[in-house]
Amino acid sequence: MATPRAPRWPPPSLLLLLLLPLLLLPPAAPGARGSLPSPAHRTLLPVAGPLSPPGAGHTAPGPGVATRRGRSGRVPRGVSAAAARNRWLESNNPEPHIGCSPSYQSQEDHSGSRKGVTAQNARMSHSSSEGPENPPLLPETSAEWSNMASSHRADIAGLRRGPSPEITTAPTAHSSLLSLESLPESPSSSRSQRRITPSQTESGTSLGFLERTRELPEEGTVHTQVAGTWVSRQASHPALEPGEPTVLSQKRNSSGQEHSGPPFSWSQSHPPPSDHPSSSGSIKNGNNFTALQNPSVTQTKSMLITDTYTNGVPRTLRSLPVGVDPADETEGFPEHSRLGITSMSVRSSPSVKDSRTNSGLTEHLGDGEGTELSTENGYGLPSIHWQSDAPSFGGRQLASSSEAGDGRAMPLTEAVFRSDPSIGGGESTGRWILTKKKTSTDAAESSALHPEAGGAGGLTQSSHAAQQPRGGGEDSGMGGRSYAESSSSSSSTSSSESLDSSAPLREHSLTGLSYTREHGSDAGQRTSSDHTDHGYVPSTFTKGERTLLSITDNTSYSEASESSTSSVKISDSPSQAQPKQSSMSSDDDEPAQSSTESPVLHTSNLPTYTSTVNMPNTLVLDTGTKPVEDPSDSRVPSTQPSPSQPQPFSSALPSTRSPGSTSETTTSSPSPSPISLLVSTLAPYSVSQTTFPHPSSTLVPHRPREPRVTSVQMSTAISAIALIPSNQTANPKNQSTPQQEKPITEAKSPSLVSPPTDSTKAVTVSLPPGAPWSPALTGFSTGPALPATSTSLAQMSPALTSAMPQTTHSPVTSPSTLSHVEALTSGAVVVHTTPKKPHLPTNPEILVPHISTEGAITTEGNREHTDPTTQPIPLTTSTTSAGERTTELGRAEESSPSHFLTPSSPQTTDVSTAEMLTSRYITFAAQSTSQSPTALPPLTPVNSCTVNPCLHDGKCIVDLTGRGYRCVCPPAWQGENCSVDVNECLSSPCPPLATCNNTQGSFTCRCPVGYQLEKGICNLVRTFVTEFKLKKTFLNTTAENHSNTQELENEIAQTLNVCFSTLPGYIRTTAHVSREPSTVFISLKTTFALASNVTLFDLADRIQKYVNSCRSSAEVCQLLGSQRRVFRAGSLCKRKSPECDKETSICTDLDGVALCQCKSGYFQFNKMDHSCRACEDGYRLENETCMSCPFGLGGLNCGNPYQLITVVIAAAGGGLLLILGVALIVTCCRKSKNDISKLIFKSGDFQMSPYTDVPKNPRSQEWGREAIEMHENGSTKNLLQMTDVYYSPTNVRNPELERNGLYPAYTGLPGSRHSCIFPGQYNPSFISDESRRRDYF
């Protein structure tokens, strides 16, 4: 346990001295800027010394205060002293700004934000040149400043501020405590990039502070950080009401340097309606605004301290008295009692939402783990920022909760968490800061710890600071990780939303949630305002895993009911709409736990309520509230995420405990499980119907003294579950939905619920854990609405110590029944909610958390009238970004953000819903009001296979990707529901010769006639078939007695079976009967085995014998006997023609097999052949064998004698030819050998020429009219043209022509001495010698 230490903070007198100049400084001229102190004084404020901002003539702060000169020493016109003060406070805060990015910050700053986180964890220091100039400290003339000046400002080191976006607010008619303004920040510099050199740090550290630091086990320096301030700025005339909360964070790093700077800043704007000046506020990165709280609240009360033990190490939570003067003997942080706890609210009409802000002062202590409480946005959701710090010397956190009232918001109490490194390395605890709030009489307040909520328009969580390992086996926490979130708004830097078509836009900027891990944390609570009741501060310790501590504190003010709740804030990036994560790493490589963000729909809140927060490993203590004196004064803003992106949301359920009600809870053994905190807020507002395609809420008119409304939320941690009952007495308004920040969820006790009257209906939501979430699932309802029962169930793991909450209710509240929890055992959780008569219809928003446990959960809601109507709406969950994991029971698992649904339906009915929740499925039963939801996705039942939709014995398998199931069909069926027959015949499943016939769900193979299917083969069998018709005489006796043909068929088949049963190889007989008007046709088929050798004659003989001694039906016997032959030859061939070759074979079926029988002279090699063959030429068939033919015969079967004929004719012809040849030869040999001239002139007609004595003449050159051409070419030839030879008749020669030489000299033949033409003439050309004669012959 951590030992008490002396107070480390300066006395309040020093702070008053520091703040006094602020009160004296007049407002500066517009557009001017305060002069910055010289760089020489750029030192930190001494912690022990007073912190005094520079006055009008005060150029430098008090001793040790570092100032720096800038461009101008003036404050812009309209900027209140509070803004100047804030600027002064921010200007002296060099700590890197690790907050949520405003909506107008680009994504470029995110990278810087990550760097800033790393630098903040590592406590890196840079040269002073990196830090931008600091604006001077400006005085504040407001009376509120003077009041707040009495508060204690602790350890405000020389705050140095870098340029940041300037936010200017103008005074308004309302009493503005402070307007915030920050100097513009250069785009290049991001809030996380501001550094401070070691020299600057050391110079500004007071001795007293260093001495206190040295006392610590590990050297470290406290860092004062302004966590951020929610500022309400009016659009036209910005004005801030009293009580602006600020958050101061103090961190230590191992370097021993003290840094102070703006850890993060927030921006929020809520434009009120026209009757009030619209106020909006936005603080950009690097802007830290600290607002002193009204010192009028000084009375504080002690708080209950709860010890929890983990690993045998006790932890003690201290109560810190809050007073004007700090007690030296107590380890307190009174200086921050007035600094970090201010609440700002904007006065507005009941129809608008008051902007409330919360800020917390967080001192990051203990092994790099600290918590920074960020402001509470319009949702009433405070946010917590965990950051890793240096070795702890005791942590303090001041949490302030917002107030809503008519300008009468009172200072809020603050919760201080102190962490002691009582547990060794490897253990760290993330803790929630207690926030308390108080209101003046007649003002109802509600506050809640909110996770950093990003703007409704969009949240950009940009920083995922890596955790740096610590020495000594310590687990370094998720140091300095924060989510930089930016939101955009229509009218201001923050995102804006139109809640109502007639109502003004409301803008909200939520901040992100960061986590750090500590070795241990002691939670102490401090109150800084009057009339505080009791605070319960539990502390938890978890080994190797951070645990979120949830604290609920209720303070009762005179005639006012107050309550505060803590909830985890989740945010999504604006553009990507995906949840960011914070990763946690440790030296021992334990799995990082991813934080998931889920958009939540935060609705208007009841004026009074108390909310209990459950966390594993901690005792969640009693919370109580008193009835609201004047709930109409309560103002709780109701916000809506912008339609541009899914919004972070916190789980919230309204719950209150009336005076006299008691709650008993039993927490289970500690387990390393983070929890999700629940926040429920109620606000009396009425807003006309508004619809958004994104999470939204409805506001209902305020009705004082309405019945209390509580909601039930149960969830289980991995190894522990705590149920805390609480009731709520207030005006029922809207109910915010539960949100679970991690797979391990908290439990919210069942409480009374007043369900809506007529306009509610049951909505059953089934959530598969991987489905995408659509922000368009929202519904709105006009008219008053009362939060209906919203039940969220989560399965708890085995060995849980469950607690049965018991709640007693005050009779003042409206009739409602107690919801009780049953069967809180491992494996199933059953919640029965039985609401009674509703008073106001409400529009419940249903959050669908992501549950990692398994089991069955049944939720039942029973209403009074009308039939139940359910609308199952699958919601989507998206897994966290890569690289981040959640460790649950030694198992790394991605947790997904929970999303919500706001279903609405025009017709409301009673609810009786029961859903089975299997692994990672969630079922909700809730009532929602009219107006159907927009863009509802198709329904997917939890188990679509409960009623098997698959036909034909199909197997149903749950499949969430499609219709919710899929059918595994048998082979014969196909289709989605196995309703389509598969045509098996396409795959040819039948054997050869068989015919496939497809049927529904099957197929058949039919062998042809004469074959039978046996063992998948068509085997040949002896088949005897016949067809005949009954005669008319048998119509009355046989056919008429059997009106049913089936009966006749059976009787005939039975008779033949008996008849043929004695024959060998008998198989069966089938009969088919068909009727016609005057006859009946009967066809029979009898089969025998092929080896039976049964013939048609055997069957005929057996039938005759059987008919003669008929023992069966007389009609059948008479029918068979009437047929001369029942089975006839050729019947099978008619039905089954083997297609025999008609020329060589004929079909026969006498033996029951249709065969082709060969004709005479032909043969078959196989009996199954359809044709027959003859023997080859020269062979004839003898005894089924082809034999050779005798000599001279050939052809078919030796029937052709051509060989013999050929031989005879050839011999005769040859002899004849031989004779003819011999005769010719003999004839030729007998010819005469006489001379040819003798043969020619043998006749007496030739005469000798008269010129025989005439000598030879030379060869004539011309002969006749044409010369005779003569030439020699190797031989001498005389060519005589016949044209030159003149034939003249004898004795007709003309002597005159002859004298004139006209006649040729020789007209005879060339070889003759005498002319043949002219006998007796001499041939002058005749040559006597033989050679010459040969030439002419």
Curated annotation (Swiss-Prot):
Protein known as: Protein HEG homolog 1
Lipid bilayer topology: Single-pass type I membrane protein
Quaternary structure, from the entry: Interacts with CCM2 and KRIT1; KRIT1 markedly facilitates interaction with CCM2.
Compositional bias of kind Gly residues: 470-480
Side Extracellular, residues: 32-1204
Species this protein is from: Mus musculus
A single cellular component GO annotation: external side of plasma membrane
Keyword Calcium: yes
Residue ranges annotated for the EGF-like domain, each copy included: 941-979, 981-1019
GO terms for biological process, alphabetical: cardiac atrium morphogenesis; cardiac muscle tissue growth; cell-cell junction organization; endothelial cell development; endothelial cell morphogenesis; heart development; in utero embryonic development; lung development
Record keywords: Calcium, Cell junction, Cell membrane, Developmental protein, Disulfide bond, EGF-like domain, Glycoprotein, Membrane, Phosphoprotein, Repeat, Signal, Transmembrane, Transmembrane helix
Location of the protein in the cell: Cell membrane; Cell junction
Function: Receptor component of the CCM signaling pathway which is a crucial regulator of heart and vessel formation and integrity. May be acting by stabilizing endothelial cell junctions.
Phosphoserine modification, residue list: S1315
Biased segments, Low complexity type: 28-40, 54-66, 175-190, 486-502, 556-575, 637-675, 868-884
InterPro entries per record: EGF-like_Ca-bd_dom (IPR001881), EGF-like_dom (IPR000742), EGF-type_Asp/Asn_hydroxyl_site (IPR000152), EGF_Ca-bd_CS (IPR018097), NOTCH1_EGF-like (IPR049883)
Annotated CDD domains: EGF_CA
Cytoplasmic side of membrane: 1226-1337
Span list, region Disordered: 28-149, 175-211, 235-296, 313-675, 723-767, 860-909
